[in-house]
UniProtKB/Swiss-Prot annotation:
Keywords: Chaperone, Cytoplasm. It comes from Schizosaccharomyces pombe (strain 972 / ATCC 24843). GO terms for cellular component: cytosol; mitochondrion. InterPro entries: DnaJ_domain, DnaJ_domain_CS, DnaJ_X, J_dom_sf. The lineage of its organism: Eukaryota, Fungi, Dikarya, Ascomycota, Taphrinomycotina. This is Uncharacterized J domain-containing protein C3E7.11c. It is found in: Cytoplasm.
Length: 355
């Protein structure tokens, strides 16, 4: 027997039954939050922002047993959280690793810009929107972006040097080496439990290994292996760039098809629309992750190269840095995700639907 509630609105917003369990509520919210993110619905940003915030509001109430009980008995008025409703966009700030990876990559610009762009209220412009004013604004924004990026790189270089010094500023004996690897293994095991933690570790680890090997192998006979490694790295970069663009185009195409079906232009059954929505969610995740991975690896390359090719530092010490970086990268690449972990929900959705 289905329980009686005084208000079904929150349940309808999340597309769940009134007797849905906590796991069902969480999964439905996560899927809908990805699908209806305002950045994917730019034709009507105000309506999209409102819908997105309602999703977060419904989830905050129904995911809390005490608030849910109040809502079922009293409706929305009786179920307002003591601290008010959370910002829906905080969800996206923690989508790829959150603060746990900040020491490695800083604040991710892609997600920051998505949240900033959608969260800002439209403002009346005080000056005429001329071509010249647009160019001036672009120049100012570009200059500020360059400044922030340089600050970010400087901080990340210091963070990485501090981490490498745990090994490089010692006698680098077998005992110290084993302890260093164990420390990094312990850190990696904690990081992998974050949202997209395993993917983040592999993106960072593969770049560490790549950059470290290029320097180490450049010291071999004629440096041929180092040159080859550099060429392979450029090929990987081109491939990743292409895949990122293709994913974005695929999302636009799928979103347009689903929009037509929702508006009744295409005669799709409910089952077909639901399946298309699930597939689109996976594709959105896949495209967003590829863009994020591109940014992560770009930053990691810049930081790694800056500390490995600092001419003010003796070559021997830079080689030691490369060896420490190589060890961290290898540890990160060996990390495997927890089977059937709730933290892997997004990854599973992306891998199932975003191919």
């Amino acid at each position: 027997m289905v329980q009686r509630v005084v208000d079904r609105d929150y349940y309808d917003i999340l597309n769940i039954s009134v007797d849905a369990d906590g796991d069902t509520i969480k999964k439905s919210y996560r899927r809908l939050a990805i699908l209806y993110h305002p950045d994917k619905n730019r034709e009507n940003p105000e309506a999209a922002r409102e819908k997105f915030q309602k999703l977060a509001e419904a989830y905050q109430v129904l995911s809390d047993p005490k608030l849910r009980e109040k809502y079922d008995k009293l409706g929305k008025v009786g179920a307002v959280p003591d601290a008010g409703f959370e910002d829906a966009f905080e969800f996206f700030k923690n989508l790829f690793g959150g603060d746990s990876f900040r020491d490695y990559v800083g604040e991710l610009n892609l997600l920051k810009e998505l949240c900033k762009m959608i969260n800002e209220e439209p403002e009346l412009k005080a000056i005429e929107d001329t071509e010249e004013s647009k160019k001036q604004l672009q120049r100012e924004e570009s200059k500020e972006a360059d400044r922030l990026l340089q600050e970010r790189i400087d901080v990340l270089c210091k963070n990485l040097l501090d981490k490498l010094s745990i090994w490089t500023e010692t006698d680098m004996s077998d005992r110290v080496t084993d302890a260093f690897k164990q420390k990094m293994q312990f850190e990696a095991e904690l990081l992998k439990d974050e949202s997209f933690g395993n993917e983040m570790l592999h993106a960072i680890g593969s770049t560490y290994v790549q950059r470290a090997n290029i320097l180490i192998q450049s010291q071999s006979f004629l440096g041929i292996r180092g040159v080859w490694g550099s060429l392979c790295a450029k090929g990987t970069l081109l491939k990743d760039t292409w895949n990122t663009v293709v994913s974005a185009v695929d999302v636009q195409s799928s979103a347009a098809a689903l929009a037509k079906a929702e508006e009744g232009e295409e005669q799709w059954s409910k089952e077909k629309r639901d399946e298309a929505a699930r597939e689109l969610t996976g594709k959105v995740l896949s495209a967003t992750w590829k863009g994020t991975r591109f940014e992560v690896q770009s930053v990691i390359r810049t930081v790694s190269d800056k500390i490995l090719y600092d001419k003010a530092v003796p070559l021997e010490k830079r080689i030691n840095r490369a060896n420490a970086l190589l060890m961290i990268g290898q540890v990160f690449l060996k990390v495997a995700p927890n089977e059937k972990s709730d933290a892997n929900y997004f990854e599973d959705l992306m891998n199932d639907r975003g191919k």
